[in-house]
Amino acid sequence: MNYQDFHNFRFKCNKLTEELVELATAMLQQRNKPKTDFHREIEDEIADVEVWLMAVKQYYNEEYINNRVSIKKQTYDL
């Protein structure tokens, strides 16, 4: 991985981490304030996480990840 690729990877990882924290925060707000509707905020953050997760996934083994997803879906009956 050259310097530019590494810089892009770090940027994407940082953005993913930021969006994961924002999603976790929105979900905790919904749990802690059940009379307030945070569904739109949660949906927005899920979308943001998906975008950056797709960007980061390209640096990892897609076959391995897909296999793990299948196993987890079976394990938790999802």
Question: What spans do the regions from the language model cover?
Answer:
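Flexible "arm" and connector segments at domain edges
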Residues: 1-78
